[in-house]
Every structure is written in structure tokens, then in C-alpha cells.
Amino acid sequence: MDSYKVIELANKYSAAAEEVRSSKMLLESRLSALGDAWQGKARDSFDQDFEETKAAYDQFEQELLETSQELKAAAVKIEERKAEIARMEELERKAREERHKLGR
């Protein structure tokens, strides 16, 4: 498995989290721009729904970031395992060479 592909995927998750954050901030700024121009029961209902939506945005952003971090950690483990395998292969190669020398 290629750790670079895993890191690339992790970066895509981070970018998606940033897009979610930006989208939420845009919605907040547009709502703020309305100020007191929109009032009443419909506004109160909207505000309540919007608070729930913001919480969902925050949760989704957090999950994307956590997934990104987990993928990056997995990429590190992949590289560690590759290094361990390479080290073991080198030890096996040296052992074969030593056996070959002793067999002469």
C-alpha cells in the first residue's frame, strides 16, 4: 500500500473540512447581514433550525478532521511497516550470504 495515496486522501478530507467551515461561515455572514430586517415567528423558527444546522456543520467538520488525522497516522504506520519489512529482508539476505560462505 502506498502511504502517499493515503496522505493524499487525508488531505482531501482536510480540504473538505475547510469547505464545510467556509460554507458555515458564509451562511452565518449572510444571516448576520439580514440583521433585524427579518423578524417574527418565522425568523425565530429559522434561527432555531439554523442553530441545529450549525451544530451539524461543526460535527461534520470535526469528523472530517478526525478521519484525516487517522489516515495520516495510518500512513505513518504503513511507512514504519515498510521499513521493518526492508530491515527484515536485509537481515535475511545477510544470513543467506553467511550460510553460503560457511557452506563453501
UniProtKB/Swiss-Prot annotation:
Give the record's keywords alphabetically. Answer: Coiled coil
The residue stretches assigned to a coiled coil in this entry are 42-104
Write down a Pfam family by its short name.
WXG100
* Superkingdom to which the source organism belongs: Bacteria
Keyword Plastid assigned: no
- Name the family the entry cites: Belongs to the WXG100 family.
What name goes with this protein? Answer: Uncharacterized protein YfjA
Origin species = Bacillus subtilis (strain 168)
* Gene transcribed to yield this protein: yfjA
